[in-house]
């Protein structure tokens, strides 16, 4: 009997060790090996330096911000956005933006932002506070990022988790058919989503994009959108509408209408989801009323 007296102790120690190892493995399962995440706390501010600025169109620029190291990723789930904040003329200004760079991108994050200059739009003579501030930043200047934020997260393979409001629990929504209406810079969260879907061979979600702009030169990221549609013709459909189209324009013209939605987006159904992002008047007076008219239930629509 003496020879076997230590067996229970050995077994107990082994069990504890196995449990600790399992807990460590589970704790690390959600982390990306070798990829430190920048946005670790959604309530914290992360000062990031401007490392590049590129003109995209007459009033739109791409701003590149450096992450803490060349190995860092931003850490932004698909469907979420970041907040940028800065003291401008003594006041704290906060704006939400969706990066156009992938969350697989290491070392930097790209934002495409339309700059609203002073004395251009008579309704807004002061222009955009944050966009003009960003435009005035010099390489090396720092601005605070905070996130992830947002009510929608795309989990992949057609599965969305959507919160009705900030205090509610997220509800699962499955969509085989994803209709997307974007206006102007509202294309950025849509590109993030479409890019993610088409980059996953296991994701068969079909995407239908209706993209509204004022003029042809205002169409942001057109080359990339058309390249994605060309490479995935069975999965991505792309259509435009312009307020002021050129003479040889082959797409639609004017505000988003019920006929455009009916023709170019998936019909109402249990596996259809419609996402919208753009100027509030477009959502309130063009998109939502026409979706209601066509019988899309509120549970199948979401506005960023």
From Swiss-Prot:
FAD binds at residues 135-165, 174-209. Its cofactor is FAD. The chain crosses the membrane at residues 6-26. Its main location: membrane. NADH-cytochrome b5 reductases are involved in desaturation and elongation of fatty acids, cholesterol biosynthesis and drug metabolism. It is found in: Membrane. It comes from the Eukaryota. It catalyses: 2 Fe(III)-[cytochrome b5] + NADH = 2 Fe(II)-[cytochrome b5] + NAD(+) + H(+). This is NADH-cytochrome b5 reductase 2. SUPFAM superfamilies: Ferredoxin reductase-like, C-terminal NADP-linked domain, Riboflavin synthase domain-like. GO terms for biological process: sterol biosynthetic process. Residues 43-155 form the FAD-binding FR-type domain. It holds the Pfam family NAD_binding_1. Its EC number is 1.6.2.2. GO terms for molecular function: cytochrome-b5 reductase activity, acting on NAD(P)H; FAD binding. One of its GO terms (cellular component) is mitochondrion. InterPro entries: CBR-like (IPR001834), Cbr1-like_FAD-bd_dom (IPR008333), FAD-bd_FR_type (IPR017927), Flavoprot_Pyr_Nucl_cyt_Rdtase (IPR001709), FNR_nucleotide-bd (IPR039261), OxRdtase_FAD/NAD-bd (IPR001433), Riboflavin_synthase-like_b-brl (IPR017938). Keywords: FAD, Flavoprotein, Lipid biosynthesis, Lipid metabolism, Membrane, NAD, Oxidoreductase, Steroid biosynthesis, Steroid metabolism, Sterol biosynthesis, Sterol metabolism, Transmembrane, Transmembrane helix. It is a single-pass membrane protein. The keyword Membrane applies. Belongs to the flavoprotein pyridine nucleotide cytochrome reductase family.
């Amino acid at each position: 009997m003496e020879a076997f007296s230590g067996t229970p102790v050995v077994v107990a120690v082994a069990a504890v060790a196995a449990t600790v190892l399992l807990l460590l493995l589970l704790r690390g399962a959600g982390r990306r090996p070798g990829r430190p995440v920048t946005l670790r706390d959604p309530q914290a501010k992360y000062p990031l330096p401007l490392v590049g600025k590129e003109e995209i169109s007459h009033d739109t620029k791409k701003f590149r911000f450096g992450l803490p190291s060349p190995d860092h990723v931003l850490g932004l789930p698909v469907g979420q956005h970041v907040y940028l904040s800065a003291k401008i003329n003594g006041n704290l200004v906060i704006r939400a933006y969706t990066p156009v760079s992938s969350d697989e991108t290491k070392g930097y994050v790209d934002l495409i932002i339309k700059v609203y200059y002073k004395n251009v739009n008579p309704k807004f003579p002061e222009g955009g506070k944050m966009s003009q501030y960003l435009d005035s930043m010099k390489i090396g200047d720092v601005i605070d990022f905070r996130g992830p934020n947002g009510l929608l997260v795309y989990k992949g393979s057609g599965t969305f988790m959507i919160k009705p409001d900030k205090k509610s629990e997220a509800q699962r929504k499955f969509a085989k058919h994803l209709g997307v209406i974007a206006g102007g810079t509202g294309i950025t969260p849509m590109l993030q989503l479409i890019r993610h879907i088409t980059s996953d061979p296991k994701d068969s979600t079909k995407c239908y994009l209706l993209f509204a702009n004022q003029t042809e030169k205002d169409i942001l990221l057109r080359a990339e959108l058309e390249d994605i549609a060309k490479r995935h013709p069975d999965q991505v459909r792309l259509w435009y509408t312009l307020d002021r189209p050129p003479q040889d324009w082959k797409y639609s013209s004017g505000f988003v209408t019920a006929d455009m939605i009916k023709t170019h987006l998936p019909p109402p159904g249990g596996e259809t989801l419609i996402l919208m992002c753009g100027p509030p008047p477009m959502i309130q007076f063009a998109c939502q009323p026409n979706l209601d008219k066509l019988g899309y239930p509120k549970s199948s629509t979401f506005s960023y």
